[in-house]
């Protein structure tokens, strides 16, 4: 019986293994070099679609026979294929990591690693790990190298971004990342900006002024014009509440018109900065279809440019780097003017914020005035207000660019400003009055609310970006503090349903929305690290639910803001307040849902997780709405353009045609504005990700929909997730075992 069985086994025809990639096998008469990606696919721009058939091990051969599968074959078998389940691929990768580590360690170390490999897929990874005297959950045992951020060195301008930035999360969708890598290699990026583009901020690029103080003052428009601009600044524009004390400034303003040439040049710069912001507000408040003659619009734009130029000249003549009276106030307002209505944040803005911070520290603003008797109560309170604004700018700009904040909380002790009106104190005050109750809505109250959220936000971003691991209990404690901070917000600034806010000003509604979005954004940053592993490690399901629910909430608010800033909306008059800071948070939420939709566990149709109440259909609907919103902004924003490209891909390849009822026609790309098509010539209106068939034909080409002409964007940024995709796992292998496996997707 056994002889018969062995004979039958010995004469069984063996299957011929497929060594070519799937695409080359279909091309016929094309020899595959078996690299990944192979040269044939790479030359056609299809590197990310180059896949190999799985090579299975002999099922009838016991391990003791000594037959082993080469490492390279097992790498190929772990590549995504039609029959590879997500769990199977993870198991293969874990075993491969252990073996590769064993090959590069001493014999004494191998025993421990082999023992570790025997239970690599066990539940031990999710069990509590003793720390000191307590038992706490550790972070995932094999964090991705991109948790520490990523440096894009392919372009002429190397750039860094932290793992919590929205572009890093988009980058974790492997096919998108591989495509953008290929685009960078093939097309590169110009290191020269178009001649018509002036980089921001202008103060970093302009030449030293030859103007005199007399000439600058003489360039002021008639007083009636200046009066209107200053009135608008104090009565409508609350972009920097408290930085300029209205009572003090208006008194100095009257004295200025009596003897203009006697005014300090830095005070004149402050005046021009306020005029510039006010003129920008006037321009932004105009209806979308302005009926004024083009000459009138051009004149207003020229006035804004002149006011900005004069502000810079005053800063230079006043030697702003040395500080002094009005220096920081003028710099802050100039900074806000450069950011006003800015669609995409620029690195020069972050550099300028660092300059402002350094000047403030040089002048001692990071130390509370109560420790210095020579500082009057009035000056001390104004210093607190200015420092509060600098803290907010540092946090906001750093978050938008995915960079660390510059302020170290351990090195500052400046107290919060008090909840006071400007009329409550002035230069002659011998002591400050007590802070008003937070039921009284002063211009400073919103500053206080933001400052308290940011104090938690700084701790959250530090934990999320630190190179050392923190216990999971630290994460949960920060989550608790974040929820407490939300509950402690003044009642007038807590987000409630728009239907119950009909008697509230549009300004207050947007302030509420900003605070709510900030809370949800910090929730994502705090829990994002566990998003990719929580489906397998149940101990992290709290983080998964918090991250997904926060992203959904942000996109719901994006839809609301977009609806209500239309001409007939409740927020139309305050639409200018929706800046790039809002866009960054919306992009972060978009990237989170794209990642989850693209990397959800197999078989998950209705819901991602039992702890997440939102279903796939609702997530797709939110992303479709978000795509429509970003599409309207493509002509002005490169970031919006990238978001649309990613959404088209994800919505076309997330299984929507299986269980959502969407048709191919419904997933056709939205028409792009003419300006966007001229700026991004490779983005064609007939491109459709939904019908794309990976590797099905050599004539299929992936249109270069995201070429980066300016080299400012960084789509090969660190991912910050425990990736469940083969190509991202191989990135980790290259670092654990150098030169053992060729890199394919490194930035």
Curated annotation (Swiss-Prot):
One Pfam family of this chain: Fungal_trans
Entry-linked CDD domains: fungal_TF_MHR, GAL4
Entry's localization field: Nucleus
Coiled-coil segments: none
UniProt entry tagged with the keyword Transcription regulation: yes
Portion annotated as DNA-binding: 21-50
S-S pairs: none
UniProt KW Metal-binding keyword: yes
Keywords assigned: DNA-binding, Metal-binding, Nucleus, Transcription, Transcription regulation, Zinc
PANTHER family: UNCHARACTERIZED TRANSCRIPTIONAL REGULATORY PROTEIN (PTHR31001), ZN(II)2CYS6 TRANSCRIPTION FACTOR (EUROFUNG) (PTHR31001:SF74)
Protein name, per record: Transcription factor phm2
Organism of derivation: Pyrenochaetopsis sp
High-level lineage: Eukaryota, Fungi, Dikarya, Ascomycota, Pezizomycotina
Gene: phm2
């Amino acid at each position: 019986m056994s002889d018969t069985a062995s004979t039958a086994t010995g004469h069984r025809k063996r299957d011929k293994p497929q060594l070519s990639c799937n695409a080359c096998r279909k091309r016929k008469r094309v020899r595959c070099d078996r690299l990944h990606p192979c040269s044939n696919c790479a030359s056609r721009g299809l590197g990310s679609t180059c896949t190999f058939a799985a090579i299975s091990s002999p099922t009838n051969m016991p391990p003791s026979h000594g037959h082993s599968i080469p490492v390279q074959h097992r790498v190929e078998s772990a590549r995504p294929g039609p029959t590879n389940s997500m769990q199977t691929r993870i198991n293969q990768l874990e075993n491969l990591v252990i073996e590769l580590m064993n090959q590069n360690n001493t014999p004494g170390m191998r025993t421990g690693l082999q023992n570790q490999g025997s239970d690599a897929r066990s539940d031990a990874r999710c069990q509590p790990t003793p720390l000191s005297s307590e038992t706490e959950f550790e972070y995932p045992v094999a964090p991705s190298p991109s948790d520490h951020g990523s440096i894009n060195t392919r372009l002429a301008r190397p750039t860094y971004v932290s793992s919590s930035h929205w572009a890093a999360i988009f980058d974790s969708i492997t096919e998108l990342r591989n495509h953008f890598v290929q685009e960078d290699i093939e097309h590169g990026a110009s290191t020269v900006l178009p001649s018509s583009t002036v980089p921001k901020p202008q103060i970093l690029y302009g030449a030293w002024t030859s103007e005199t103080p007399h000439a600058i003052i003489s360039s002021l428009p008639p007083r009636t014009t200046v009066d209107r601009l200053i009135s608008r600044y104090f009565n409508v524009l609350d972009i920097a509440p408290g930085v300029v004390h209205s009572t003090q400034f208006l008194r100095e303003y009257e004295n200025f018109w009596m003897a203009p040439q006697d005014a300090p040049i830095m005070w004149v710069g402050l005046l021009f900065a306020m005029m510039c912001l006010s003129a920008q507000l006037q321009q932004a408040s105009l209806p979308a279809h302005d009926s004024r003659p083009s000459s009138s619009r051009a004149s207003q734009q020229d006035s804004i440019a002149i006011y900005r130029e004069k502000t810079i000249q005053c800063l230079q003549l006043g030697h702003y780097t040395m500080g002094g009276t009005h220096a920081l106030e003028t710099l802050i307002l100039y900074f806000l003017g450069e950011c006003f209505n800015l669609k995409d944040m620029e690195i020069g803005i972050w550099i300028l914020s660092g300059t402002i911070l350094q000047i403030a520290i040089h002048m001692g603003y990071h130390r509370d005035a109560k420790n210095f008797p020579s500082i009057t109560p009035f000056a001390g309170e104004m210093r607190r207000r200015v420092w509060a604004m600098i803290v907010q700018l540092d946090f906001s700009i750093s978050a938008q660019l995915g960079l660390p904040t510059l302020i170290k909380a351990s090195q500052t002790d400046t107290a919060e400003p008090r909840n006071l009106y400007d009329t409550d104190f002035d230069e002659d005050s011998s002591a400050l009055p007590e802070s008003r109750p937070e039921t009284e809505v002063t211009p400073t109250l919103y500053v206080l609310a933001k400052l308290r959220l940011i104090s938690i936000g700084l701790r959250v971003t530090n934990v999320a970006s630190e190179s050392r691991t923190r216990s999971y209990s630290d994460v949960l404690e920060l989550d608790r503090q974040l929820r407490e901070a939300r509950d402690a917000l003044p009642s007038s600034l807590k987000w409630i349903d728009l239907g119950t806010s009909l008697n509230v000003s549009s300004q207050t509604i947007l302030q509420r929305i900003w605070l709510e979005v900030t809370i949800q954004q910090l929730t994502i940053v705090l829990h994002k690290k566990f998003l990719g592993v929580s489906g397998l490690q149940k101990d992290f399901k709290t983080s998964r639910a918090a991250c997904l629910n926060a992203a959904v909430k942000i996109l719901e608010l994006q839809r609301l803001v977009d609806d209500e800033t239309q001409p007939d909306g409740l927020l139309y008059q305050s639409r200018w307040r929706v800046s790039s800071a809002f866009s960054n948070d919306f992009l972060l939420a978009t990237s989170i849902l794209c990642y989850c939709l693209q990397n959800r566990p197999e078989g998950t149709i209705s819901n991602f997780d039992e702890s997440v109440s939102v279903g796939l259909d609702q997530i797709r609907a939110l992303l479709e709405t978000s795509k429509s919103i970003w599409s309207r902004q493509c002509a002005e924003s490169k970031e919006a353009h990238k978001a649309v490209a990613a959404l088209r891909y994800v919505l076309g390849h997330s299984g929507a045609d299986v269980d959502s009822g969407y048709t191919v026609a419904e997933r056709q790309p939205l028409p792009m504005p003419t300006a966007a098509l001229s700026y991004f010539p490779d983005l064609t209106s007939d491109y459709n990700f939904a019908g794309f068939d990976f590797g099905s034909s050599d004539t299929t080409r992936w249109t270069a929909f995201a070429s980066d002409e300016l080299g400012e964007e960084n789509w090969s940024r660190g991912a910050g997730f425990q990736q469940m995709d083969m190509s991202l796992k191989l990135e980790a292998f290259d670092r654990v075992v150098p030169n053992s496996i060729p890199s394919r997707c490194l930035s």
